[in-house]
Amino acid sequence: MESSSTIDPAEVAKFEAMAAEWWNPHGKFKPLHQMNPCRLDYITQQIAAEFDRDLSAPLPFEGLRLLDIGCGGGLLSEPMARLGAEVIGADAAPRNIPVAKLHAEQSGLTIDYRNTTAEALAAAGERFDVVLNMEVVEHVADPLTYLTACRELLKPGGLMICSTLNRNPKSFAMAIVGAEWVMRWLPKGTHDWSKFITPDELYDLIRKAGLDPVDRKGMVFNPVSWSWSLSARDLSVNYVTASVRRS
């Protein structure tokens, strides 16, 4: 794997230690398993709208080349492959790749998993119709450099979906105190609140990287139904954005 100025070794080490847990819905990645239907709803709707695809078709994303950055064990890569996309899953943590490969093989899916970075792929001339950049930007050392690499990875007209965590007292209370300290959904230290990014800050970074933001939604957890939903108004903790490379 090529070195990169945006890779934070301490952040990579956190997820290396949890690699075997990726496909355990009751394990350390339980929050991502719970959030995944909400994330997939947003991703599929945005891709369908941008590329004029019919989600009721058998393989609606056939012909689209998609990169899942920070793919982990493949929680998003696999659904995208099932929808017909040609999927490349990239992760900076080496131990995640064999976990993802094995699960894809067991599921009868063809996914190209690589231990690499966004910068290395961009330097190699790789280009994609869609880049998924989900819960990654808050873990990198230099968000602008990282997002600029994401822009380079997109073909003109390509779509980037980027999700992260807002930075405010509520997100500290829920994502750090609640999720890590009280509920213990995640190991302590998984997130660094100082690296969280407000929606306006992210939009500014996306524009500076050369992309055009076109949509953003909150992802809101309901403790009564124990489920996640999209919200046009509540971006106070988790949120997701869509951006397009115009040229």
From Swiss-Prot:
Keywords: Methyltransferase, S-adenosyl-L-methionine, Transferase, Ubiquinone biosynthesis. Pathway: Cofactor biosynthesis; ubiquinone biosynthesis. Its EC number is 2.1.1.222, 2.1.1.64. SUPFAM superfamilies: S-adenosyl-L-methionine-dependent methyltransferases (SSF53335). GO terms for biological process: methylation. GO terms for molecular function: 2-polyprenyl-6-hydroxyphenol methylase activity; 3-demethylubiquinol 3-O-methyltransferase activity; polyprenyldihydroxybenzoate methyltransferase activity. S-adenosyl-L-methionine binds at residues 39, 70, 91, 134. InterPro entries: SAM-dependent_MTases_sf, UbiG_MeTrfase. It catalyses: a 3-demethylubiquinol + S-adenosyl-L-methionine = a ubiquinol + S-adenosyl-L-homocysteine + H(+); a 3-(all-trans-polyprenyl)benzene-1,2-diol + S-adenosyl-L-methionine = a 2-methoxy-6-(all-trans-polyprenyl)phenol + S-adenosyl-L-homocysteine + H(+). It comes from the Bacteria. Disulfide bonds: none annotated. The keyword Cell division does not apply. O-methyltransferase that catalyzes the 2 O-methylation steps in the ubiquinone biosynthetic pathway. PANTHER family: METHYLTRANSFERASE, UBIQUINONE BIOSYNTHESIS O-METHYLTRANSFERASE, MITOCHONDRIAL. HAMAP family: UbiG. Belongs to the methyltransferase superfamily. UbiG/COQ3 family. This is Ubiquinone biosynthesis O-methyltransferase. It comes from Cereibacter sphaeroides (strain ATCC 17023 / DSM 158 / JCM 6121 / CCUG 31486 / LMG 2827 / NBRC 12203 / NCIMB 8253 / ATH 2.4.1.).
